[in-house]
């Protein structure tokens, strides 16, 4: 049986950045689901079981630590993104860390690497 494209859940409260991520990942062959809040992200994870979650560390001022821990416990690969300096402190807790602003090519390359490892 043939597997479809790897599903990536983009959890980002900035609609413009969410769109940039979606377009670049879809053009690179990934299937993409989106969430703008932690509640939407939890629902999407339960409904769609993504292979990888791209998680904004600070969603509308809310830290995503709890969701990160839930995803890691479930064995889901997590790429953290953040525009704040504290994102590097999470390197041991996430599968990958991407500091904003990032280049679309960096997003796609990191996503490919994590998808290949899962």
Task: Enumerate the language-model features and the residues they cover.
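Two-component/phosphorelay signaling modules centered on CheY-like receiver
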Residues: 15-33
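Short amphipathic alpha-helix used as the core "switch/output" element in two-component signaling
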Residues: 43, 62-76
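Conserved acidic carboxylate
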Residues: 12
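Acidic, metal-coordinating helix/loop segments flanking the phosphotransfer/catalytic sites
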Residues: 34-52
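Non-catalytic signal-transmission and effector/linker regions of two-component phosphorelay proteins
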Residues: 1-9, 39-42, 69, 103-118
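A Lys-centered signature of the CheY-like receiver
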Residues: 100
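Active-site residues of response regulator receiver
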Residues: 56
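Hydrophobic/aromatic residues positioned on beta-strands within the core alpha/beta folds
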Residues: 81-82
């Amino acid at each position: 049986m043939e597997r479809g494209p790897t599903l990536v859940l983009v959890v980002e409260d900035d609609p413009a950045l969410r769109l940039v991520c979606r377009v670049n990942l879809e053009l690179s062959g990934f299937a993409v689901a989106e969430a703008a809040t932690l509640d939407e992200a939890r629902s999407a994870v339960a409904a769609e079981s993504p292979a990888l979650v791209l998680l904004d560390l600070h969603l509308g001022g809310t830290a995503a630590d709890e969701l990160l821990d839930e995803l890691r416990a479930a064995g889901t690969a997590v790429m953290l993104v953040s525009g704040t300096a504290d994102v590097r402190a999470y390197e041991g807790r996430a599968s990958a860390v991407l500091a904003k602003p990032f280049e679309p090519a960096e997003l796609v390359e990191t996503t490919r690497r994590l998808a290949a490892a899962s």
